[in-house]
């Protein structure tokens, strides 16, 4: 962070950071705007009637005393809905809820849902025994099969994967890397791929199994259990990918020195998402791909099911106090879930938003938190 007279003026990448290597994505570059945004809430506010849009400023002592009193009620009726804020804050809230006997915090973020983080973590847990987000080293591979992972746009860490894509194309293994993208739509990643395979949504797992089975046969090895139950004719019919194309892709994967298969995004967001993720991850075991490795163990990625359960508890009146931090559920959640209507059955709603977003305007209190440039914590890597 470049500062002048104690004021942040620009954010740049750290050349020594293993992820960005001195670069930064547009979202990071513009984050300084949140610090000086004229609409930023400067002090705690109390609603003059929920939903009225009218608030009065209150002292921090009164705000903190109110929050403390709200936590003193029946712990079973206290709920925390968090976004994808830094891990230190999630860990702190998790410890607080455990100590007071309240339900564990629910985590949600629209972007995380689009990325299918929870599905990928669960597939990794069932495949490797460790719940964590895998990192895929594109730069160390020579052939990459991307199933729905639009890593050149917003998927997980677009900056790190863009750098990896550049290394893939430069040919670390002596030849230019080859990219095949399996997506129903032609995203940015599919647009620059050597081959774009427009599969029928929900059939990505069958395609991965077909490629795995055929690649194992080409290599002359035993067919792994993950691919043993495949019906090739069924895979062709349900995926829309011809048998000839599947044989071509299997040969490409089998002959690669360091192939890599990446599950994510759209492939995991459709029906059979978990099964597809497991089948795609299993492709990496065919030749012992070293280009995929696990980040720190992490089970904190929220699922839509946990949010639905929370909304149902709100509707039934089980929740008397709701704390919301780092997420705007009134805007981000599908309207069909009825989150804003469910809020009417909650006695007290506290938002920690720094801006008057849709959820904050329907809350009883707004206790604005620091921005990332004003706080310090940790992130598991």
Where are these regions (language model features)?
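A glycine-rich, hydrophobic/aromatic-adjacent loop/helix-cap motif
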Residues: 253-320
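Flexible glycine/proline-rich, aromatic-decorated loop/lid segments
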Residues: 188, 357-381
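Short, polar loop motifs at secondary-structure junctions
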Residues: 182-187, 352-358
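A short, gly/pro- and small-residue-rich
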Residues: 154-175, 279-282, 334-349
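Conserved thiamine diphosphate
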Residues: 192, 217, 223-239
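Conserved short loop/turn motifs at secondary-structure junctions
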Residues: 77-86, 237-238, 264-270, 297-300, ...
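N-terminal export/assembly segments and adjacent metallocofactor-ligating motifs
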Residues: 1-220, 242-248, 325, 366
């Amino acid at each position: 962070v470049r500062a002048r007279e104690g004021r942040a003026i620009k954010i740049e990448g750290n050349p020594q950071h293993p992820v960005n290597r001195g670069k930064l994505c547009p979202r990071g570059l513009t984050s300084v705007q949140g610090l000086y945004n004229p609409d930023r809430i400067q002090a705690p506010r109390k609603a003059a009637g929920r939903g009225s849009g009218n608030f009065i400023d209150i002292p921090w002592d009164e705000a903190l005393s109110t929050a403390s009193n709200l936590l003193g009620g029946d712990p079973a009726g206290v709920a925390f809905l968090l976004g994808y804020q830094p891990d230190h804050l999630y860990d702190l809230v998790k410890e607080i809820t455990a100590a007071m006997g309240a339900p564990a915090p629910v985590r949600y973020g629209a972007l995380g849902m689009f990325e299918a983080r929870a599905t990928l973590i669960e597939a990794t847990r069932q495949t490797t025994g460790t719940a964590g987000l895998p990192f895929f080293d594109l730069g160390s591979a020579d052939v990459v099969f991307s199933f729905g992972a639009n890593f050149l746009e917003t998927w997980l860490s677009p900056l790190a994967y863009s750098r990896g894509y550049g290394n893939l194309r430069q040919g670390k293994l002596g030849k230019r890397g080859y990219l095949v993208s399996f997506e129903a739509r032609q995203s940015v990643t599919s647009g620059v791929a050597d081959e774009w395979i427009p599969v029928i949504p929900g059939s990505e797992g069958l395609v991965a199994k077909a490629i795995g089975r055929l690649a194992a046969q080409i290599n002359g090895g035993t067919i792994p259990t993950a691919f043993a139950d495949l019906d090739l004719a069924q895979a062709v019919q349900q995926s829309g990918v011809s048998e000839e194309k599947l044989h071509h892709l299997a040969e490409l994967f089998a002959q690669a020195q360091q192939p890599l298969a990446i599950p994510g995004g759209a492939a995991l967001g459709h029906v059979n998402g978990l099964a597809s993720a497991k089948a795609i991850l299993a492709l990496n075991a065919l030749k012992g791909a070293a280009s995929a490795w696990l980040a720190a163990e992490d089970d904190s990625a929220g699922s839509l099911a946990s949010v639905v359960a929370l909304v149902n508890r709100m509707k039934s009146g089980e929740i008397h106090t709701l704390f919301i931090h780092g997420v705007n559920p009134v805007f981000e959640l599908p309207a069909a879930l009825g989150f804003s209507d469910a809020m009417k059955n909650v006695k007290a709603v506290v938002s920690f938003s720094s801006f008057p977003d849709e959820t904050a305007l329907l809350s009883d209190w707004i206790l604005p938190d620091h921005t990332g440039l004003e706080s310090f914590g940790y992130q598991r890597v």
